[in-house]
């Protein structure tokens, strides 16, 4: 076997969706699929399909987004997620009761505490299987970037849900945190020109809109701040969510013409 073929074989093994998750977790996901609660959405690509080592931006849709993408994405992926959900059972229970269910989903605090006695252990099990990349709101964010770059170099794609959900989850996204822009910028400085896919998961329509990828180098030419770039991609994400069937058909037709 030549050196090139050996490297290609090793890369394929590293990037295999089956190798990206442990055996017990793959079995756990099969069980969840049998429940048929998180159905596979129809993926609508307005450009190239997902490629390895890319950055994927998506709306959150509460727990529906991460669960659906994990169950039905064939690409080897890593998710960004708040460190509280990756720091043990006690930390996760506190976060889910006080922040997720009470503040974001507006549950009664006592109901949230009772529900999370059952929900949190199951959620922690799922998050452990995800091999989540922890995110932070302080200087520890450097760890997030470092681990994410290592994942990209292994051929894994990183999925980020950057919306500000402090007031809850909305179909029309209100703002994006700019941490993912900083990540793409750092990759670029280290010689990695990240392909960035803006996507929108439409639960009601059962569609997953995937915009044509744009490399970070193209965004850098715009001379915008991180916040401005995040807002620009936020607007595009919302546009994807509002596209009519006619607009989708037109976009796909234009893509075909460009290829020709």
PLM region descriptions:
Residues 37-41, 131-132, 242:
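Short aromatic/hydrophobic-glycine micro-motifs
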Residues 51-137:
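Catalytic core of membrane glycerolipid acyltransferases/transacylases, capturing the structured
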Residues 47-48, 69-70, 189, 200:
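A general structural signal for short secondary-structure junctions and capping/turn motifs
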Residues 24, 28-62, 71:
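Helix-to-loop junction immediately C-terminal to a conserved catalytic motif
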Residues 30, 68, 122-126, 183, ...:
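Amphipathic alpha-helical segments that form well-ordered structural scaffolds
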Residues 2-15, 137-260:
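Non-catalytic C-terminal accessory region of glycerolipid acyltransferases
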Residues 1-38:
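N-terminal membrane-anchoring alpha-helices
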Residues 24-28, 119, 176:
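Residue-level preference for nonpolar/small residues embedded in alpha-helices
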């Amino acid at each position: 076997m030549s050196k090139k073929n050996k490297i290609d074989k090793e890369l394929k093994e590293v990037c295999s969706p089956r190798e990206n998750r442990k055996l017990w977790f793959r079995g756990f996901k099969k069980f969840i699929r049998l429940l048929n609660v998180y159905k596979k959405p129809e993926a609508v690509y307005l450009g190239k399909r997902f490629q390895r080592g890319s950055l994927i931006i998506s709306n959150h849709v509460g727990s529906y987004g991460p669960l659906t993408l994990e169950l039905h994405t064939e690409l080897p992926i890593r998710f960004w997620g708040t460190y509280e959900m990756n720091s043990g059972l006690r930390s996760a229970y506190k976060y889910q009761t006080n922040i997720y269910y009470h503040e974001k989903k507006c549950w009664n605090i006592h109901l949230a505490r009772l529900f999370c006695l059952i929900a949190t252990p199951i959620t922690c099990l799922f998050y452990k299987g995800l091999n989540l990349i922890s995110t932070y709101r302080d200087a520890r964010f450097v760890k997030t970037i470092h681990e994410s770059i290592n994942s990209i170099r292994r051929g894994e794609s990183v999925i980020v849900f950057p919306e500000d959900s402090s007031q809850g989850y909305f179909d029309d996204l209100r703002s994006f945190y700019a941490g993912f822009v900083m990540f793409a910028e750092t990759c670029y400085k280290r010689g990695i020109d990240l392909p960035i896919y803006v996507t929108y998961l439409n639960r009601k329509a059962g569609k997953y809109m995937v915009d044509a990828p744009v490399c970070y180098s193209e965004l850098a030419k715009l001379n915008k701040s991180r916040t401005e770039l995040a807002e620009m991609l936020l607007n595009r994400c919302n546009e994807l969510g509002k596209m009519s069937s006619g607009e989708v058909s037109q976009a796909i037709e234009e893509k075909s013409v460009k290829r020709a």
